[in-house]
């Protein structure tokens, strides 16, 4: 796809898929920002992480613990920046018809967001087990991952349907005629 067309589709296009992708990009940027805040604390740029008033949260203690530095000898907040950036890039890649034209993109995005959700939940479990407290910032990022997965799965299912239809020899017109529209989740 030509860059000009991609730019137009991503910025001005209208579809349920693009709406979902925009939400995922926004949630991923939020996750990266949270990773940045935690990373600033973990590297000594800021001295303390304020928490909401609850005994469940002690972000400064959790993010200074052995747990927070146990992967790749790097503060985990800095790793969060990278992983959420990859998710944002996957959400932003491809045009508005990528479930048909590049089905591996929505499938990869769904796989990444589901994996991230499981990892975030596992890390929350580790946080609690080792510290008897949670990082409030990290739990917001966990929610962002869970919502991103919920948004990514319907389009990945459409992409899988398209791949299966292609293998079965159906034309795209037949697939779209038979396809049931997957509406956005409502609150």
How would you label these PLM feature ranges?
Residues 1-187:
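Short amphipathic, positively biased membrane-proximal segments
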